[in-house]
Amino acid sequence: MNSVSPAAAQYRSGSPEDARRPEGRRPRGPRVPDPNGPRPSGASGPALGSPAAAPGEPDEVDKFKAKFLTAWNNVKYGWAVKSRTSFSKISSVHLCGRRYRFEGEGDIQRFQRDFVSRLWLTYRRDFPPLAGGCLTSDCGWGCMLRSGQMMLAQGLLLHFLPRDWTWAEGPGLGPSEPAGLASPNRYRGPARWMPPRWAQGTPELEQERRHRQIVSWFADHPQAPFGLHRLVELGQSSGKKAGDWYGPSLVAHILRKAVESCSEITRLVVYVSQDCTVYKADVARLVARPDPTAEWKSVVILVPVRLGGETLNPVYVPCVKELLRSELCLGIMGGKPRHSLYFIGYQDDFLLYLDPHYCQPTVDVSQADFPLESFHCTSPRKMAFAKMDPSCTVGFYAGDQKEFETLCSELTRVLSSSSATERYPMFTLAEGHAQDHSLDDLCSQLSQPTLRLPRTGRLLKAKRPSSEDFVFL
Protein backbone atom coordinates (compact mmCIF):
# COMPACT_ATOMS: atom_id res chain seq x y z
CA MET A 1 0.00 0.00 0.00
CA ASN A 2 1.45 3.31 -1.05
CA SER A 3 0.90 5.13 2.19
CA VAL A 4 2.96 6.46 5.02
CA SER A 5 1.87 6.70 8.61
CA PRO A 6 4.50 8.98 8.99
CA ALA A 7 6.14 7.73 12.07
CA ALA A 8 8.70 8.92 10.26
CA ALA A 9 6.23 11.56 11.38
CA GLN A 10 3.88 9.81 13.88
CA TYR A 11 0.73 11.17 12.36
CA ARG A 12 -2.44 10.61 14.29
CA SER A 13 -5.98 10.37 13.10
CA GLY A 14 -8.97 12.61 13.56
CA SER A 15 -11.73 12.30 16.09
CA PRO A 16 -14.63 9.82 15.62
CA GLU A 17 -18.21 10.79 15.05
CA ASP A 18 -19.60 12.63 18.01
CA ALA A 19 -21.53 10.55 20.50
CA ARG A 20 -24.16 12.15 22.61
CA ARG A 21 -22.90 13.09 26.01
CA PRO A 22 -24.80 11.65 28.96
CA GLU A 23 -26.79 14.18 30.91
CA GLY A 24 -26.91 13.90 34.64
CA ARG A 25 -29.22 15.58 37.08
CA ARG A 26 -29.94 19.18 36.30
CA PRO A 27 -29.17 21.48 39.21
CA ARG A 28 -31.06 24.73 39.54
CA GLY A 29 -27.84 26.71 39.35
CA PRO A 30 -25.97 27.58 36.16
CA ARG A 31 -24.67 24.57 34.30
CA VAL A 32 -22.29 23.81 31.48
CA PRO A 33 -24.50 23.01 28.48
CA ASP A 34 -24.62 19.74 26.62
CA PRO A 35 -22.85 20.47 23.30
CA ASN A 36 -25.23 18.30 21.32
CA GLY A 37 -28.42 19.38 23.03
CA PRO A 38 -30.26 22.67 23.33
CA ARG A 39 -28.15 25.58 24.48
CA PRO A 40 -29.45 26.71 27.88
CA SER A 41 -29.39 30.27 29.00
CA GLY A 42 -28.48 29.26 32.53
CA ALA A 43 -30.26 30.07 35.74
CA SER A 44 -29.54 32.16 38.75
CA GLY A 45 -29.31 30.99 42.31
CA PRO A 46 -27.58 28.02 43.90
CA ALA A 47 -28.54 24.38 43.50
CA LEU A 48 -30.66 22.73 46.16
CA GLY A 49 -28.61 21.18 48.88
CA SER A 50 -25.47 23.13 47.99
CA PRO A 51 -24.08 26.21 49.68
CA ALA A 52 -24.71 29.50 47.93
CA ALA A 53 -21.80 30.56 45.76
CA ALA A 54 -20.46 34.07 45.78
CA PRO A 55 -21.75 36.24 42.92
CA GLY A 56 -19.89 35.50 39.72
CA GLU A 57 -18.31 32.30 41.09
CA PRO A 58 -19.39 28.74 40.31
CA ASP A 59 -20.72 26.58 43.13
CA GLU A 60 -19.40 23.10 43.89
CA VAL A 61 -22.01 21.39 41.69
CA ASP A 62 -21.04 23.54 38.71
CA LYS A 63 -17.35 22.89 39.32
CA PHE A 64 -17.94 19.15 39.45
CA LYS A 65 -20.02 19.15 36.28
CA ALA A 66 -17.43 21.25 34.45
CA LYS A 67 -14.72 18.79 35.47
CA PHE A 68 -16.89 15.86 34.41
CA LEU A 69 -17.58 17.32 30.96
CA THR A 70 -13.90 18.16 30.54
CA ALA A 71 -12.88 14.61 31.43
CA TRP A 72 -15.53 13.10 29.16
CA ASN A 73 -14.52 15.37 26.30
CA ASN A 74 -10.84 14.49 26.68
CA VAL A 75 -11.61 10.77 26.87
CA LYS A 76 -13.22 11.03 23.43
CA TYR A 77 -10.38 13.12 22.06
CA GLY A 78 -7.65 11.01 23.65
CA TRP A 79 -9.16 7.82 22.23
CA ALA A 80 -8.87 9.27 18.74
CA VAL A 81 -5.25 10.25 19.31
CA LYS A 82 -4.30 6.61 19.90
CA SER A 83 -5.23 5.62 16.35
CA ARG A 84 -3.07 6.48 13.38
CA THR A 85 -3.93 8.00 10.05
CA SER A 86 -1.99 7.26 6.90
CA PHE A 87 -0.94 9.71 4.23
CA SER A 88 -0.39 8.66 0.64
CA LYS A 89 3.17 8.69 -0.68
CA ILE A 90 1.88 9.29 -4.19
CA SER A 91 -0.53 12.19 -3.74
CA SER A 92 0.51 15.69 -2.76
CA VAL A 93 -0.48 17.18 0.57
CA HIS A 94 -1.54 20.83 0.52
CA LEU A 95 -1.13 22.74 3.77
CA CYS A 96 -1.77 26.49 4.07
CA GLY A 97 -1.08 27.00 0.38
CA ARG A 98 2.10 24.91 0.32
CA ARG A 99 2.54 21.58 -1.46
CA TYR A 100 4.34 18.58 0.05
CA ARG A 101 5.24 15.12 -1.27
CA PHE A 102 6.36 12.46 1.20
CA GLU A 103 9.15 11.14 -1.00
CA GLY A 104 11.92 11.47 1.56
CA GLU A 105 12.72 12.25 5.17
CA GLY A 106 13.38 15.89 4.32
CA ASP A 107 9.89 16.30 2.85
CA ILE A 108 8.31 14.87 5.99
CA GLN A 109 10.36 17.13 8.25
CA ARG A 110 9.37 20.23 6.29
CA PHE A 111 5.71 19.27 6.58
CA GLN A 112 6.18 18.60 10.30
CA ARG A 113 7.70 22.00 10.90
CA ASP A 114 5.01 23.79 8.89
CA PHE A 115 2.10 22.00 10.57
CA VAL A 116 3.41 22.41 14.11
CA SER A 117 3.92 26.15 13.52
CA ARG A 118 0.18 26.81 13.06
CA LEU A 119 -1.50 28.18 16.19
CA TRP A 120 -3.81 25.67 17.88
CA LEU A 121 -6.50 27.22 20.08
CA THR A 122 -8.65 24.80 22.03
CA TYR A 123 -11.12 24.53 24.86
CA ARG A 124 -9.65 25.80 28.14
CA ARG A 125 -10.62 25.42 31.76
CA ASP A 126 -10.08 27.35 35.00
CA PHE A 127 -10.03 30.81 33.44
CA PRO A 128 -11.67 33.89 35.03
CA PRO A 129 -15.49 33.70 34.87
CA LEU A 130 -17.03 34.95 31.66
CA ALA A 131 -19.05 38.16 31.84
CA GLY A 132 -22.68 37.74 32.82
CA GLY A 133 -22.22 34.30 34.34
CA CYS A 134 -19.91 31.99 36.20
CA LEU A 135 -18.60 29.72 33.43
CA THR A 136 -14.86 29.12 33.76
CA SER A 137 -14.58 26.77 30.77
CA ASP A 138 -15.89 26.78 27.21
CA CYS A 139 -15.86 22.99 26.99
CA GLY A 140 -18.89 21.82 25.02
CA TRP A 141 -19.94 25.10 23.40
CA GLY A 142 -16.98 27.28 22.35
CA CYS A 143 -15.55 25.26 19.47
CA MET A 144 -16.68 27.64 16.70
CA LEU A 145 -15.19 30.60 18.54
CA ARG A 146 -11.93 28.64 18.86
CA SER A 147 -11.97 27.81 15.14
CA GLY A 148 -12.46 31.50 14.40
CA GLN A 149 -9.56 32.36 16.69
CA MET A 150 -7.33 29.95 14.77
CA MET A 151 -8.28 31.49 11.43
CA LEU A 152 -7.56 35.00 12.72
CA ALA A 153 -4.30 33.77 14.28
CA GLN A 154 -3.19 32.44 10.89
CA GLY A 155 -3.93 35.85 9.39
CA LEU A 156 -1.86 37.55 12.10
CA LEU A 157 1.06 35.19 11.48
CA LEU A 158 1.01 36.17 7.80
CA HIS A 159 0.63 39.83 8.74
CA PHE A 160 3.49 40.11 11.23
CA LEU A 161 5.90 37.32 10.24
CA PRO A 162 7.51 36.16 6.97
CA ARG A 163 5.45 33.69 4.95
CA ASP A 164 8.11 31.01 5.38
CA TRP A 165 8.29 31.48 9.17
CA THR A 166 8.20 28.34 11.28
CA TRP A 167 8.42 27.85 15.02
CA ALA A 168 12.10 27.28 15.73
CA GLU A 169 11.41 25.15 18.82
CA GLY A 170 8.57 23.17 17.31
CA PRO A 171 8.65 19.51 18.41
CA GLY A 172 8.27 16.53 16.13
CA LEU A 173 4.81 15.22 15.40
CA GLY A 174 3.24 12.86 17.89
CA PRO A 175 0.48 12.70 20.50
CA SER A 176 -0.89 16.15 21.23
CA GLU A 177 -0.89 15.84 25.00
CA PRO A 178 1.11 18.90 26.11
CA ALA A 179 3.38 18.51 29.09
CA GLY A 180 4.35 20.80 31.89
CA LEU A 181 1.31 23.08 31.87
CA ALA A 182 0.30 24.80 35.05
CA SER A 183 -3.19 25.93 35.97
CA PRO A 184 -2.61 29.35 37.51
CA ASN A 185 -4.82 30.64 40.30
CA ARG A 186 -4.18 34.30 39.61
CA TYR A 187 -4.58 36.12 36.32
CA ARG A 188 -2.79 39.28 35.38
CA GLY A 189 -3.57 39.49 31.70
CA PRO A 190 -1.28 39.60 28.65
CA ALA A 191 2.12 41.06 29.30
CA ARG A 192 5.32 41.59 27.39
CA TRP A 193 7.51 38.54 27.07
CA MET A 194 11.14 38.68 28.20
CA PRO A 195 13.29 36.73 25.72
CA PRO A 196 15.24 33.84 27.23
CA ARG A 197 17.69 33.31 24.39
CA TRP A 198 19.24 34.68 21.19
CA ALA A 199 21.35 37.79 20.98
CA GLN A 200 19.54 41.10 21.19
CA GLY A 201 18.40 42.48 17.85
CA THR A 202 18.60 39.25 15.82
CA PRO A 203 15.76 38.47 13.38
CA GLU A 204 15.05 35.20 15.21
CA LEU A 205 14.58 37.07 18.48
CA GLU A 206 12.21 39.62 16.96
CA GLN A 207 10.17 36.89 15.27
CA GLU A 208 9.89 34.88 18.49
CA ARG A 209 8.84 38.00 20.37
CA ARG A 210 6.12 38.62 17.82
CA HIS A 211 5.07 34.97 17.91
CA ARG A 212 4.58 35.11 21.67
CA GLN A 213 2.79 38.44 21.43
CA ILE A 214 0.30 36.98 18.96
CA VAL A 215 -0.31 34.03 21.28
CA SER A 216 -0.88 36.40 24.21
CA TRP A 217 -3.60 38.25 22.26
CA PHE A 218 -5.68 35.04 22.39
CA ALA A 219 -5.23 34.45 26.12
CA ASP A 220 -8.29 33.45 28.13
CA HIS A 221 -8.44 36.69 30.06
CA PRO A 222 -10.79 39.70 29.81
CA GLN A 223 -7.93 41.98 28.75
CA ALA A 224 -6.85 39.87 25.76
CA PRO A 225 -8.11 41.57 22.55
CA PHE A 226 -8.96 38.28 20.80
CA GLY A 227 -9.49 36.05 23.83
CA LEU A 228 -12.66 34.14 24.53
CA HIS A 229 -13.87 36.75 27.03
CA ARG A 230 -13.67 39.51 24.42
CA LEU A 231 -15.36 37.47 21.69
CA VAL A 232 -18.23 36.49 24.00
CA GLU A 233 -18.62 40.15 24.98
CA LEU A 234 -18.83 41.22 21.33
CA GLY A 235 -21.37 38.48 20.62
CA GLN A 236 -23.79 39.94 23.14
CA SER A 237 -24.88 42.63 20.67
CA SER A 238 -26.14 39.78 18.46
CA GLY A 239 -28.09 38.19 21.28
CA LYS A 240 -25.47 35.57 22.12
CA LYS A 241 -23.99 34.77 25.50
CA ALA A 242 -21.55 32.35 27.06
CA GLY A 243 -22.84 28.81 26.63
CA ASP A 244 -24.70 29.51 23.37
CA TRP A 245 -23.90 27.98 20.00
CA TYR A 246 -22.13 30.33 17.55
CA GLY A 247 -22.38 29.85 13.79
CA PRO A 248 -19.53 30.53 11.33
CA SER A 249 -21.21 33.64 9.89
CA LEU A 250 -21.72 35.24 13.29
CA VAL A 251 -18.15 34.44 14.35
CA ALA A 252 -16.87 36.18 11.21
CA HIS A 253 -18.60 39.41 12.28
CA ILE A 254 -17.37 39.01 15.86
CA LEU A 255 -13.78 38.76 14.58
CA ARG A 256 -14.30 41.90 12.49
CA LYS A 257 -15.43 43.83 15.56
CA ALA A 258 -12.54 42.48 17.63
CA VAL A 259 -9.94 43.68 15.13
CA GLU A 260 -11.66 47.06 14.78
CA SER A 261 -11.47 47.61 18.53
CA CYS A 262 -7.87 46.43 18.97
CA SER A 263 -5.57 49.41 19.51
CA GLU A 264 -2.44 47.29 19.04
CA ILE A 265 -3.24 46.52 15.39
CA THR A 266 -3.63 49.58 13.18
CA ARG A 267 -2.64 48.31 9.73
CA LEU A 268 -5.04 45.39 9.52
CA VAL A 269 -8.79 45.37 8.85
CA VAL A 270 -11.37 42.62 8.43
CA TYR A 271 -13.97 42.56 5.66
CA VAL A 272 -16.99 40.23 5.87
CA SER A 273 -18.79 39.61 2.60
CA GLN A 274 -22.51 40.20 2.13
CA ASP A 275 -24.83 37.69 0.48
CA CYS A 276 -21.90 35.50 -0.62
CA THR A 277 -20.46 38.42 -2.62
CA VAL A 278 -17.14 40.23 -2.18
CA TYR A 279 -17.52 43.82 -3.41
CA LYS A 280 -14.13 45.06 -4.53
CA ALA A 281 -14.88 48.75 -4.06
CA ASP A 282 -15.99 48.13 -0.48
CA VAL A 283 -12.72 46.35 0.26
CA ALA A 284 -10.73 49.14 -1.39
CA ARG A 285 -12.54 51.78 0.64
CA LEU A 286 -11.84 49.84 3.82
CA VAL A 287 -8.09 49.46 3.25
CA ALA A 288 -7.30 52.76 1.51
CA ARG A 289 -5.59 55.57 3.44
CA PRO A 290 -6.58 59.26 3.38
CA ASP A 291 -3.30 59.96 1.60
CA PRO A 292 -3.63 58.46 -1.91
CA THR A 293 0.13 57.86 -2.04
CA ALA A 294 0.18 55.86 1.20
CA GLU A 295 0.22 52.08 1.20
CA TRP A 296 -2.99 50.14 1.64
CA LYS A 297 -3.76 48.45 4.92
CA SER A 298 -3.67 44.68 5.01
CA VAL A 299 -7.03 42.93 4.94
CA VAL A 300 -8.52 39.65 6.12
CA ILE A 301 -11.51 38.76 3.93
CA LEU A 302 -14.09 36.41 5.45
CA VAL A 303 -16.75 34.87 3.21
CA PRO A 304 -19.61 32.99 4.93
CA VAL A 305 -21.06 30.43 2.52
CA ARG A 306 -23.37 27.44 2.46
CA LEU A 307 -22.31 24.60 0.20
CA GLY A 308 -25.41 22.45 0.14
CA GLY A 309 -28.55 21.57 2.04
CA GLU A 310 -28.25 19.19 4.96
CA THR A 311 -24.94 17.83 3.65
CA LEU A 312 -22.10 19.10 1.49
CA ASN A 313 -22.92 19.16 -2.22
CA PRO A 314 -19.99 17.27 -3.81
CA VAL A 315 -19.91 19.59 -6.82
CA TYR A 316 -18.20 22.17 -4.58
CA VAL A 317 -15.29 19.92 -3.59
CA PRO A 318 -13.02 20.84 -6.57
CA CYS A 319 -13.49 24.54 -5.81
CA VAL A 320 -12.73 24.04 -2.11
CA LYS A 321 -9.52 22.23 -3.07
CA GLU A 322 -8.52 25.05 -5.41
CA LEU A 323 -9.00 27.63 -2.67
CA LEU A 324 -7.00 25.62 -0.12
CA ARG A 325 -4.11 25.47 -2.60
CA SER A 326 -3.79 29.26 -2.59
CA GLU A 327 -1.12 30.86 -0.38
CA LEU A 328 -3.58 33.73 0.20
CA CYS A 329 -6.22 31.43 1.70
CA LEU A 330 -6.44 31.32 5.51
CA GLY A 331 -8.40 28.08 5.51
CA ILE A 332 -12.01 27.31 6.34
CA MET A 333 -13.87 27.76 9.60
CA GLY A 334 -16.46 24.99 9.62
CA GLY A 335 -16.43 21.35 10.64
CA LYS A 336 -18.93 18.55 10.99
CA PRO A 337 -22.52 19.16 12.13
CA ARG A 338 -22.42 20.51 15.71
CA HIS A 339 -18.66 19.95 15.79
CA SER A 340 -16.53 22.85 14.60
CA LEU A 341 -13.09 22.32 13.03
CA TYR A 342 -10.53 24.54 11.33
CA PHE A 343 -9.57 23.21 7.87
CA ILE A 344 -6.09 24.16 6.67
CA GLY A 345 -5.37 21.77 3.80
CA TYR A 346 -6.20 18.48 2.13
CA GLN A 347 -4.90 15.32 0.48
CA ASP A 348 -7.00 13.52 -2.10
CA ASP A 349 -10.56 13.36 -0.73
CA PHE A 350 -9.64 14.21 2.85
CA LEU A 351 -9.40 17.55 4.61
CA LEU A 352 -6.59 18.34 7.07
CA TYR A 353 -7.74 20.16 10.16
CA LEU A 354 -6.99 21.45 13.63
CA ASP A 355 -9.46 20.30 16.27
CA PRO A 356 -10.36 22.69 19.13
CA HIS A 357 -12.15 20.06 21.23
CA TYR A 358 -9.29 19.06 23.51
CA CYS A 359 -9.73 20.84 26.86
CA GLN A 360 -6.49 22.14 28.37
CA PRO A 361 -5.58 24.16 31.46
CA THR A 362 -5.46 27.91 31.06
CA VAL A 363 -1.97 29.30 30.55
CA ASP A 364 -0.95 32.49 32.33
CA VAL A 365 0.72 34.40 29.49
CA SER A 366 1.82 37.19 31.83
CA GLN A 367 4.63 34.94 33.03
CA ALA A 368 7.98 35.38 31.35
CA ASP A 369 8.71 32.53 28.95
CA PHE A 370 5.23 31.02 29.39
CA PRO A 371 4.89 27.51 27.88
CA LEU A 372 3.93 27.44 24.21
CA GLU A 373 3.43 23.70 23.76
CA SER A 374 -0.34 23.80 24.29
CA PHE A 375 -0.74 26.40 21.52
CA HIS A 376 0.81 24.17 18.83
CA CYS A 377 -0.63 20.83 17.74
CA THR A 378 1.60 17.88 16.87
CA SER A 379 -1.14 15.62 15.49
CA PRO A 380 -2.38 16.17 11.92
CA ARG A 381 -5.91 14.89 11.42
CA LYS A 382 -7.92 13.99 8.34
CA MET A 383 -11.64 13.98 7.57
CA ALA A 384 -13.50 13.01 4.42
CA PHE A 385 -14.94 15.90 2.42
CA ALA A 386 -18.31 14.11 2.52
CA LYS A 387 -18.54 14.70 6.30
CA MET A 388 -18.03 18.46 6.01
CA ASP A 389 -20.87 20.66 7.26
CA PRO A 390 -22.09 22.83 4.34
CA SER A 391 -22.23 25.96 6.51
CA CYS A 392 -18.75 27.47 6.80
CA THR A 393 -16.64 30.61 6.39
CA VAL A 394 -13.67 30.84 4.02
CA GLY A 395 -10.84 33.24 4.90
CA PHE A 396 -8.26 35.09 2.79
CA TYR A 397 -5.41 37.50 3.51
CA ALA A 398 -3.98 40.26 1.31
CA GLY A 399 -1.00 42.16 2.69
CA ASP A 400 -1.15 45.07 0.24
CA GLN A 401 -2.83 46.33 -2.92
CA LYS A 402 -0.77 44.07 -5.18
CA GLU A 403 -1.70 40.97 -3.19
CA PHE A 404 -5.35 41.99 -3.22
CA GLU A 405 -5.27 42.26 -7.00
CA THR A 406 -3.55 38.86 -7.17
CA LEU A 407 -6.21 37.40 -4.91
CA CYS A 408 -9.01 38.80 -7.08
CA SER A 409 -7.40 37.27 -10.17
CA GLU A 410 -7.07 33.88 -8.48
CA LEU A 411 -10.64 33.93 -7.21
CA THR A 412 -12.00 34.98 -10.60
CA ARG A 413 -10.18 32.06 -12.21
CA VAL A 414 -11.31 29.52 -9.61
CA LEU A 415 -14.93 30.66 -9.40
CA SER A 416 -15.35 30.79 -13.19
CA SER A 417 -13.51 27.55 -13.97
CA SER A 418 -15.04 24.91 -16.21
CA SER A 419 -15.98 22.82 -13.18
CA ALA A 420 -18.24 25.66 -12.01
CA THR A 421 -20.13 26.33 -15.24
CA GLU A 422 -23.15 24.15 -14.46
CA ARG A 423 -23.73 25.18 -10.86
CA TYR A 424 -23.81 28.16 -8.59
CA PRO A 425 -20.31 29.34 -7.59
CA MET A 426 -19.30 29.18 -3.94
CA PHE A 427 -19.41 32.98 -3.90
CA THR A 428 -18.89 35.83 -6.33
CA LEU A 429 -16.67 38.86 -6.85
CA ALA A 430 -18.35 42.08 -7.92
CA GLU A 431 -17.15 45.52 -8.92
CA GLY A 432 -18.47 48.56 -7.08
CA HIS A 433 -20.13 48.82 -3.69
CA ALA A 434 -22.81 46.64 -2.14
CA GLN A 435 -24.97 49.74 -1.75
CA ASP A 436 -24.84 50.42 -5.50
CA HIS A 437 -25.93 46.89 -6.36
CA SER A 438 -28.80 47.05 -3.89
CA LEU A 439 -29.98 50.33 -5.45
CA ASP A 440 -29.74 48.90 -8.97
CA ASP A 441 -31.79 45.86 -7.93
CA LEU A 442 -34.43 48.10 -6.37
CA CYS A 443 -34.68 50.30 -9.47
CA SER A 444 -35.03 47.28 -11.75
CA GLN A 445 -37.85 45.97 -9.57
CA LEU A 446 -39.66 49.32 -9.56
CA SER A 447 -39.43 49.60 -13.35
CA GLN A 448 -41.36 46.35 -13.81
CA PRO A 449 -45.19 46.25 -13.89
CA THR A 450 -46.75 45.57 -10.54
CA LEU A 451 -49.41 42.87 -10.24
CA ARG A 452 -51.96 43.56 -7.51
CA LEU A 453 -53.67 40.52 -6.05
CA PRO A 454 -57.12 40.73 -4.44
CA ARG A 455 -57.28 40.09 -0.72
CA THR A 456 -59.04 36.75 -0.47
CA GLY A 457 -58.40 35.95 3.12
CA ARG A 458 -55.84 35.92 5.86
CA LEU A 459 -52.35 36.69 4.65
CA LEU A 460 -49.67 34.20 5.52
CA LYS A 461 -46.64 35.68 7.21
CA ALA A 462 -43.46 34.63 5.49
CA LYS A 463 -40.78 33.04 7.59
CA ARG A 464 -37.91 35.42 8.09
CA PRO A 465 -34.58 33.82 7.25
CA SER A 466 -31.98 33.74 9.97
CA SER A 467 -28.59 35.39 9.69
CA GLU A 468 -27.05 31.95 9.12
CA ASP A 469 -29.16 31.14 6.02
CA PHE A 470 -27.73 31.38 2.52
CA VAL A 471 -28.86 30.70 -1.02
CA PHE A 472 -27.47 27.32 -2.01
CA LEU A 473 -27.71 24.70 -4.71
Swiss-Prot record:
InterPro entries from the UniProt entry: Papain-like_cys_pep_sf (IPR038765), Peptidase_C54 (IPR005078), Peptidase_C54_cat (IPR046792)
UniProt record similarity statement: Belongs to the peptidase C54 family.
GO molecular function, one term: cysteine-type endopeptidase activity
Signal peptide: none
Activity regulation, free text: Inhibited by N-ethylmaleimide.
Composition skew (Basic and acidic residues), residue ranges: 15-26
Protein name listed in UniProt: Cysteine protease ATG4D
Active site (catalytic residues): 143, 355, 357
UniProt PTM: Cleaved by CASP3 during apoptosis which leads to increased activity. The cleavage by CASP3 reveals a cryptic mitochondrial targeting sequence immediately downstream of their canonical caspase cleavage sites which leads to mitochondrial import of the protein.
Modified residues (Phosphoserine): 466
Entry EC number(s): 3.4.22.-
Keyword annotations: Apoptosis, Autophagy, Cytoplasm, Hydrolase, Mitochondrion, Phosphoprotein, Protease, Protein transport, Thiol protease, Transport, Ubl conjugation pathway
Disease involvement: Defects in ATG4D are the cause of a neurodegenerative disease present in the Lagotto Romagnolo dog breed. Affected dogs suffer from progressive cerebellar ataxia, sometimes accompanied by episodic nystagmus and behavioral changes. Defects are caused by impaired autophagy: neuronal cells display cytoplasmic vacuolization in the nervous system, as well as spheroid formation and cytoplasmic aggregation of vacuoles in secretory epithelial tissues and mesenchymal cells.
One cellular component (GO) term of this entry: nucleoplasm
Annotated site location: Cleavage: 62-63
Species, as recorded: Canis lupus familiaris (Dog)
Effect of residue 430 to T: Found in dogs with neurodegenerative disease
Region of interest (Cryptic mitochondrial signal peptide), ranges: 63-102
Catalytic activity: [protein]-C-terminal L-amino acid-glycyl-phosphatidylethanolamide + H2O = [protein]-C-terminal L-amino acid-glycine + a 1,2-diacyl-sn-glycero-3-phosphoethanolamine; [protein]-C-terminal L-amino acid-glycyl-phosphatidylserine + H2O = [protein]-C-terminal L-amino acid-glycine + a 1,2-diacyl-sn-glycero-3-phospho-L-serine
Lineage: Eukaryota, Metazoa, Chordata, Craniata, Vertebrata
Keyword Protein transport: yes
Biased segments, Low complexity type: 39-56
